Structure formats: structure tokens, C-alpha cells
């Protein structure tokens, strides 16, 4: 990833297209090697007996990820606007090389986690038994059901991320201030200060930093109840429904502003949209890696952890065309339908949570 950003740093008018594609390819490959395996190692740092702690662990991991997101959108964006984007890419590359050194120095603290490929179930066995483990046995019926359950959660998470990413577009281009390229449906002023639209990204990162440890505590408390914590499917469904409140708030704000024909609505719509997006995200997204670490068959762990970011990639590719297509229709009607569909997806998943839970528990 660091090499990718250095390619962008060296981009010129003559080689810019090639260097930017080099950056995209290298960063994508680096992310593929890095992201899923880091989550796998984090999952293996905790023994099988403490698997319920994984929800808390991955909530905290998600918090630190969003510290990076918040700092990047808040501070690195200032480097881009003041010193140029090539300088910003150079700084990104330097940080990643520092991170690489930090990783190698800190590897000794991982113990046995990550020393062997995820073919051995060292969640419950000593890693020294790795070479003796037979990994060519077919999947059991329970393992197949768990793979299906993981894929179901992943598909619904893809729906969530598709709408989540797309929600940024009306915030910027319909509700954004005219001075920043928007249509001015909302007033971004705080007193005499006009909030930069880039801070909407920062707001999400900041809210995730605040909410992740809070929800980690909530899940820990809920596990102590006689009925236990909510399952992954319930949390995913609730996260999707809350995201529906985000698009619903935009529909209300668009109607109040007359879609630009009346006075702009207050900044409340921006804040409410960000809160709903962040709440929906924090309720289920950090737990995806925990869920996969708990239930993925040992020899498919790395692959299944890679499927999670893969579906996010497809959502990231699809939201732009979807936003452009919705632009052909009346905003209130189009996004009203989107709200109904996303809430319906959450309700459908909520209705089948018991069946899905039985699939992963083998009941």
C-alpha cells in the first residue's frame, strides 16, 4: 500500500493515468493481504473459551480503524488542499512504511497467532500441532450451514453498504452548500462559519470512535442476561433499519426544503444523517469479523474474512450508478422507495433471525 501511494506521489501530467492505476492496483493488493488477515489474527489472539469477547475485541478494533479514518479526512485532507495532493500521497506512503516497521517490531506480542496459515484450528489447539493437522477433510453439514449463514450476513451487509455509501451523495450534492458544489437544500452554517463538506466524513469517524467502546460495553452487559446477547443476524437487521432512518430523514428534509424551492433546512439533517449512518454501522459492522472468526471452518477462515471486504468493494462500485439512476426521478419519491426497500430488508432479516441462528449453532 505504501508503494501505491508513492506511485501517486510521483504522478505527473505525462504519466498521471498510469501512476494512478498503479496506486489503485497496489493499494488494492495490499489491502487484500492486510485487512482480512489482521482480523483473523485478532480473532486468534483469544481462545475459543472466550469467543463471546470477540464482539468487544472487534468493536475496539473498529474504533481504532476509525481513529485513522477521522485523522485522514480531517487532517490529511488539509495537506491536500494546502500543499497539494502529491504531498498528501507522500505523507500517506510514509505513514504506511512506518506502520510496516511497527508491525514487524510488534509481531512478537502476537504469540502463536498468525504463525501458521488458517488451516489449523489453533483457536483450541497448540500451533505446534499445525503440521500434523489434516486439512483435506470435507466440510461437515454444520460447517456448510455456517458458511451459508456467513454468506447471508455478507449479502445483507452488501445491501447496507450500498445504501450507506450512496447516502453521501445527496448530502454533498443536494444538501451541500452551493459554495462547495451542492444545491443548497440545507444550511451548513454554524453561526457565521460554513462547515466544510469533508467534515461530514470526519463526523462519521468521530462518532464511530465514540460509539464503538459504548456498544462494546452494551454487548458485554447483554451477554450477562439469561437470554444472552442479540445474535449477529438481529444486529445486522437493526443496523439496516437504522440506515433506513437516515434516508428517511433526507426525504423529510427534501420535502421541507421544497427540493431547493424553499428556504434551506437546518444543519439538523446533516447531523441526523451522520448519526443514523454511524449507529447503523457500529451496531453490526465491527461484529462481522467476530462472527466469521467464531463460525468459519478453519480452512476457510482467511477466505471468509476476505469475502467481507469483497462485498464492500462491489457496493462501492455500485452506489455511483445507483445514485445517478435515482437522479432521473423526483428525489422525495425515489428516496422514499429506497427507504421502504432498505427498511423492508431489515424487517425480513429480523423475521428469520431465529432460523439463521439455529444454522450456526447446529440446533
Feature-to-residue mapping (PLM):
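Cytoplasmic membrane-interface "Motif A"-like loop-to-helix N-cap segments
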Residues: 1, 221-241
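A generic transmembrane-helix signature of 12-TM secondary carrier transporters
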Residues: 4-5, 23-24, 93, 99-100, ...
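Intracellular juxtamembrane helix-capping segments at the cytosolic ends
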Residues: 33-48, 283-296
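Intracellular loop-helix junctions on the cytosolic face of multi-pass helical membrane proteins
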Residues: 48-50, 55, 76-199, 215, ...
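Glycine-rich segments within core transmembrane alpha-helices of 12-TM secondary carriers
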Residues: 53-81, 93-99, 204-208, 302-319
Amino acid at each position: 500500500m505504501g508503494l501505491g501511494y508513492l506511485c501517486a506521489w510521483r504522478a505527473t501530467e505525462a504519466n498521471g493515468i498510469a501512476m494512478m492505476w498503479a496506486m489503485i492496483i497496489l493499494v488494492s493488493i495490499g489491502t487484500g493481504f492486510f485487512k482480512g488477515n489482521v482480523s483473523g489474527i485478532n480473532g486468534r489472539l483469544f481462545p475459543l473459551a472466550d469467543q463471546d469477547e470477540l464482539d468487544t475485541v472487534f468493536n475496539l478494533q473498529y474504533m481504532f480503524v476509525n481513529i485513522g479514518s477521522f485523522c485522514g479526512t480531517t487532517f490529511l485532507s488539509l495537506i491536500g488542499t494546502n500543499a497539494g495532493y502529491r504531498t498528501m500521497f507522500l505523507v500517506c506512503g510514509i505513514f504506511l512504511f512506518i506502520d510496516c516497521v511497527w508491525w514487524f517490531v510488534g509481531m512478537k506480542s502476537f504469540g502463536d497467532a498468525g504463525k501458521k496459515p488458517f488451516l489449523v484450528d489453533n483457536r483450541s489447539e497448540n500451533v505446534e500441532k499445525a503440521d500434523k493437522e489434516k486439512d483435506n477433510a470435507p466440510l461437515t453439514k454444520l460447517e456448510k450451514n455456517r458458511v451459508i449463514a456467513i454468506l447471508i450476513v455478507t449479502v445483507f451487509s452488501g445491501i447496507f453498504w450500498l445504501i450507506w455509501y450512496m447516502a453521501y451523495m445527496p448530502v454533498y450534492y443536494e444538501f451541500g452548500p452551493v459554495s462547495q458544489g451542492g444545491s443548497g437544500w440545507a444550511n451548513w452554517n454554524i453561526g457565521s462559519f460554513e462547515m466544510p463538506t469533508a467534515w461530514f466524513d470526519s463526523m462519521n469517524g468521530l462518532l464511530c470512535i465514540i460509539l464503538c467502546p459504548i456498544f462494546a460495553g452494551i454487548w458485554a452487559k447483554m451477554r450477562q442476561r439469561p437470554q444472552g446477547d442479540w445474535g449477529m443476524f438481529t444486529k445486522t437487521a437493526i443496523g439496516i433499519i437504522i440506515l433506513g432512518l437516515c434516508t428517511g430523514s433526507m426525504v423529510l428534509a427534501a420535502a421541507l426544503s421544497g427540493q431547493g424551492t424553499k428556504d434551506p433546512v437546518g444543519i439538523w439533517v446533516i447531523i441526523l444523517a451522520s448519526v443514523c449512518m454511524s449507529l447503523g454501522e457500529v451496531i453490526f459492522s465491527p461484529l462481522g469479523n467476530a462472527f466469521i472468526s467464531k463460525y468459519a471452518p478453519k480452512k476457510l477462515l482467511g477466505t471468509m474474512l476476505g469475502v467481507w471486504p469483497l462485498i464492500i468493494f462491489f457496493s462501492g462500485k455500485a452506489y455511483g450508478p445507483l445514485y445517478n439512476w435515482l437522479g432521473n426521478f423526483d428525489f422525495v419519491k425515489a428516496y422514499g422507495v429506497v427507504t421502504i426497500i432498505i427498511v423492508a430488508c431489515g424487517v425480513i432479516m429480523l423475521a428469520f433471525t431465529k432460523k439463521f441462528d439455529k444454522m450456526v449453532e447446529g440446533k
